[in-house]
Amino acid sequence: MVSKLSPLQQELLNALLNSGVTKEDLIQALDDMIPSPSFGVKLENLHMSPEHESDNKPVFHTLTNGHHHKGKLSGDEGSEDGDDFDTPPILKELQSLNTEEAAEQRAEVDRMLSEDPWRAAKMIKGYMQQHNIPQREVVDITGLNQSHLSQHLNKGTPMKTQKRAALYTWYVRKQREIVIQFNQTVQGSGNITGKSSQDQLLFLFPEFNQQNPVPGQPDDSCSEPANKKMRRNRFKWGPASQHILYQAYERQKNPSKEEREALVEECNRAECIQRGVSPSKAHGLGSNLVTEVRVYNWFANRRKEEAFRQKLAMDAYSTGPSHPHNLNSLLSHGSPHHTQPSTSPPSKLQGMRYNQQGNNEVTSSSTISHHGNNAMVHSQSVLQQVSPVGLDHSHSMLSPDGKLISVSGGGLPPVSTLTNIHNLSQSVHHNHQQSQNLIMAPISGVMAITQNLNTSQAQSVPVINSVAGSLAALQSVQFSQQLHSPHHQQIMQQSSGHMAQQPFMATVTQLQNSHMYAHKHEPPQYSHTSRFPSAMVVTDTSSISTLSNMSSSKQCPLQAW
């Protein structure tokens, strides 16, 4: 005969035999330790009621006596709930009944106690899921700890026999209760039709079990305290009904009343089939009965959830890229870039970057590269400025100290950042009038200004004039008509129309990208092109004479006011 013991068990048994314990002692010890078919309680130790014989499974007599709970019963090993557990009222109630039905229930409970606790727990859990029974109902009736009950049903955590007897008693009685509920005919239901019938059935059945007790049971039930009222079970959608409703939601998100009533019949039929009863007994669903109002609320909740998810998605999208924190982002989102073809490295391309840093410094760097006979001017103005919140109207974006920019063999880079950031908060009308008249003139044009101030063809055009820290003041200066060549007029018309729609700071890049400062392949029309190439300058009217008297030393002092 092959031994069923594992190697570890054989080793332990050999150690016991080698320790001097005889075979008879081991058998006697095993008889004392192993629970008997009477569930660990010896028959001679039981206090039997006089009306019951020893063949009536006396487990309830043992469990209902408080002084016998100290015995080690099956299923007690490893129980984490160490609190003393008084005899549940449901056990006392069942023990006090002398009817044939009560005897059958006790026999069923004893049979379940003799089986594997984990198998019984899985059976009870499946039954609760099939009928949508919440654990709260079991806790209210049996007095068990909900955490311990959940662990026992889901993980097979050991539970004391007395507690398992209370759980099994509830399970046996619930089975009979549901059978009676489906077979019971509601009195007076023939006078109620339509939705009102379903609503009354909904509120009638939770109390139906207490108003119509099982025959043979006493009216004053001791299963619950006299002053404690049983709560009505909350409605819970079953998996069968949810499957039907989600399919209907894909077809129609807002069904009509007729469609909802058809869904009610379909859901109740599915719930009955799930419970293993005929669809004609849908009234026995009790608190789980599906009504038209519940279907309407289910669709309304799904529509609200979908609208809420869409709103969250839109908010997440709108708060992402639409709030730039630097000028580069503002320019990239404000207008498309039209870059000029160039063979210079990317680091030398024209651009502007506005960084929010702690220092109020403005640096400008210019790199000029020559390719053949054409001199390309590449400038990069890096603005390191504090956040606009920290600025006031007395601050300017350029440092107050003057700087000299030495240029050899080329023109000056365009000065396109002379503006006050606080002028962006002015009225739209005022900005519209200013931005339509803003221009920047090349140095050769300034030379022409000094020579043609008294010509008859001159017209008054405002030029940016920076005076005493205010960089937004405009002053009219007589410009010569020859400044406005056809090429310049077309550019100024485009720039004026664009600046009328957007703030000036966002227009700077548009003016740069419109080839206004690019090298012109057409012959220049100014008189001093050999001295000053077509570089742009923003100057004060008091400095025009100084610029006109400059020599050809290729070093042009440009003071940042």
UniProtKB/Swiss-Prot annotation:
Keywords: Activator, DNA-binding, Homeobox, Nucleus, Transcription, Transcription regulation. Residues 1-31 are annotated as: Dimerization. PROSITE patterns: HNF_P1 (PS51937), HOMEOBOX_1 (PS00027), HOMEOBOX_2 (PS50071), POU_4 (PS51936). Residues 49-87, 319-372 are annotated as: Disordered. It is found in: Nucleus. Residues 332-347 have a biased composition (Low complexity). Expressed at high level in kidney, liver and intestine. At lower level in lung and testis. Not found in heart, spleen and muscle. One of its GO terms (cellular component) is nucleus. Residues 319-331, 353-372 have a biased composition (Polar residues). Residues 230-310 bind DNA. Residues 49-58 have a biased composition (Basic and acidic residues). Pfam families: HNF-1_N, HNF-1B_C. Residues 92-187 form the POU-specific atypical domain. A motif (Nuclear localization signal) lies at residues 228-236. InterPro entries: HD (IPR001356), HNF-1 (IPR039066), HNF-1_N (IPR006899), HNF-1_POU (IPR044869), HNF1_dimer_N_dom_sf (IPR023219), HNF1b_C (IPR006897), HNF_P1 (IPR044866), Homeodomain-like_sf (IPR009057). One of its GO terms (molecular function) is RNA polymerase II cis-regulatory region sequence-specific DNA binding. Residues 77-86 have a biased composition (Acidic residues). GO terms for biological process: endocrine pancreas development; genitalia development; insulin secretion; kidney development; liver development; positive regulation of DNA-templated transcription; regulation of transcription by RNA polymerase II. The keyword Nucleotide-binding does not apply. Residues 1-32 form the HNF-p1 domain. PANTHER family: HEPATOCYTE NUCLEAR FACTOR 1 (PTHR11568), HEPATOCYTE NUCLEAR FACTOR 1-BETA (PTHR11568:SF2). Belongs to the HNF1 homeobox family. Binds DNA as a dimer. Can form homodimer or heterodimer with HNF1-alpha-A or -B. Transcription factor that binds to the inverted palindrome 5'-GTTAATNATTAAC-3'. This is Hepatocyte nuclear factor 1-beta. It comes from Xenopus laevis (African clawed frog). The lineage of its organism: Eukaryota, Metazoa, Chordata, Craniata, Vertebrata.
